[in-house]
């Protein structure tokens, strides 16, 4: 896959970058990435993936832009209030990089449709705001052997990890699943919604950009991805911490008793 002269100029800072270079930029151009959610995390994530030259971006979101979204969902603007988020995101991506193909999925990802959606892409990034979607996405990515970058934000805190449970580590042990990290969703109502607890707008930008970095890393293959590691960010005290987590042999996806 060749580059036009405009693409060479556009991606020049990647092409000269050790770890990406021309081969890595070609991988980005060939890549298909599914982004779940065009909200607080999905907005900066889409911006950086489009700018990086990912060849195809799919976005799953069935919501419309609300005025209260604009404090953090920076891909949308005031004129977009009331508009479908996938439509607003499509315009923003095209404005940023017209070389990127955009596919909007006007629906909510769930256990019934997740595998079909995931199967059409190479990498998945989940920026959803509920556990039902997170479990559905992580299960589907396991079954379809797709890397999953998953992030979450609270009021002043955020977390990020990368899941590749269809592969094994250097010791020959399966990589952990999302269910190894969170075996069960929290009780209903125990985690307040963003509208109740609030969220620091800039925090979603920080984590969304870090999610984009993990996606680019997964495509290009450089560095040490967050597989088996949970990155925690405390924005109140501006502290970062990384916690290791292991494969749980009792997990239902790739545990010892899981169906083969």
Locations of the language-model features?
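Adenine nucleotide-associated cytosolic modules
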Residues: 1-260
